[in-house]
């Protein structure tokens, strides 16, 4: 789920990470605050600075949503396997949740390139293969993008044996983005219409192998984001009580739908709506959801790990059995001691 939505994740290693990505992903994960170690935030429009300490800066997410919020019933049909492009997967989920037809992200195609010492073939939008030429002293790849309107740009880059990519705005260096082994969506910053965004990275000139590149650059449609945020926030779950294993809140649903929860779906969650037990669903095979009807409802969640009751009964039974065996053993020992003392007394009598 996280990997297909553009977050760094390794299914083989069972490793899942958070990296600053898009405001919509932060909505889905319930992120309210961000801490930036370098103090640099490429897109300040989506966050608000709240504190600074040396080089560390904390930000408040302007598009934060509560732990639960009302989404359309079509969200239950969402599948992460419909597309390999993380932006289009987000577009699909956003449309199902909100019913808004306009896409949240729009693809920005390559304006031109400035490669050096590398032969590159394009295999479709975002997909390339390259072959470094041994004669080049410092081979590198360079892609330029130019949005047609003021926007926030985001990129998804997957390339082997590259640790970071340099980002330029109108030929001016802005920052370097570290690339993890697990690729993910990252922000490029805010751009005016006609401004040039450049991604440039060096290629290992010792390599004689073909390399594969996946590079998507998309523009965020901020009006669509704002419309969707206002809609989802209006159906937010108002939390009234919570603990490590319990959560209670009130949801005002203006239509039949699903209460999406930024909580991983597990069998251990038990949910009641207005005091009645209800079945949960898994959204995208990962997140918890609860079908609700229109109206005002009290939703209560309680977590008890699957197998806890059976495990407790087995453990209790084992303790009782051990206690019973211990008591029997002690009685037998006392009986043996009594018999031994009696025999010694008879032996000692005149």
Question: Model-flagged regions — what are they?
Answer:
Residues 87-116:
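Predominantly extracellular/luminal regions of secreted and cell-surface proteins
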Residues 112-342:
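Active-site-proximal, structured, solvent-exposed surfaces of multi-pass membrane proteins
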Residues 1-11, 18-21, 50-62, 70-71, ...:
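Extracytoplasmic/secretory soluble proteins
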Residues 1-25, 65, 70-75, 81-90, ...:
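Extracytoplasmic/lumenal acceptor-recognition loop(s) of multi-pass membrane glycoenzymes
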Residues 24, 29-85:
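Aromatic/acidic, Gly/Pro-rich catalytic loop(s) in extracytoplasmic/lumenal soluble domains
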Residues 340-350:
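Solvent-exposed, low-complexity, intrinsically disordered
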Residues 32-33, 84-87, 98, 102-103, ...:
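Hydrophobic beta-strand segments of well-ordered beta-sheets in folded domains
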């Amino acid at each position: 789920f996280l990997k297909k939505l553009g977050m760094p994740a390794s299914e083989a290693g069972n490793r899942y990470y958070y990296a600053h990505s898009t405001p919509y992903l932060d909505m889905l994960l319930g992120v309210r605050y961000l801490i930036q170690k370098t103090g640099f935030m490429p897109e300040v429009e989506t966050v608000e600075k709240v504190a600074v300490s040396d080089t560390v800066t904390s930000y408040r997410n302007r598009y934060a949503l509560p732990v639960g919020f009302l989404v359309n019933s079509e969200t239950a049909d969402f599948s992460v396997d419909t597309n390999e492009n993380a932006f289009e997967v987000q577009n699909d989920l956003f449309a199902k949740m909100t019913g808004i037809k306009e896409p949240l992200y729009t693809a920005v195609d390559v304006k031109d390139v400035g490669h050096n010492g590398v032969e590159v073939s394009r295999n479709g939008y975002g997909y390339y293969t390259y072959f470094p030429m041994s004669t080049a002293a410092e081979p590198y790849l360079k892609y330029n993008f130019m949005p047609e309107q003021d926007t926030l740009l985001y990129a998804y880059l997957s390339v082997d044996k590259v640790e970071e990519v340099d980002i330029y705005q109108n030929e001016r260096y802005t920052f370097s983005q570290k690339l993890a082994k697990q690729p993910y969506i990252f922000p490029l910053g805010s751009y005016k219409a006609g401004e040039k965004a450049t991604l440039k990275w060096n290629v290992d000139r010792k390599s004689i192998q073909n390399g594969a590149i996946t590079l998507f650059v998309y523009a965020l449609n901020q009006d669509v984001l704002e419309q969707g945020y206002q809609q989802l926030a209006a159906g937010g779950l108002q939390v009234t009580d919570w603990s490590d294993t319990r959560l209670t809140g009130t949801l005002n649903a203006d239509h039949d739908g699903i209460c999406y929860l930024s909580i991983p779906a597990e069998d251990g969650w038990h949910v009641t709506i207005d005091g009645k037990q209800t079945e949960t669903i898994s959204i995208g095979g990962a997140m918890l959801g609860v079908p609700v009807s229109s109206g005002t409802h009290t939703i209560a969640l309680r977590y008890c790990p699957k197998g806890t009751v059976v495990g407790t009964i087995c453990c209790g039974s084992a303790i009782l059995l051990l206690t019973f065996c211990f008591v029997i053993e002690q009685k037998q020992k006392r009986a043996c001691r009594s018999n031994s003392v009696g025999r010694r007394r008879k032996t000692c009598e005149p």
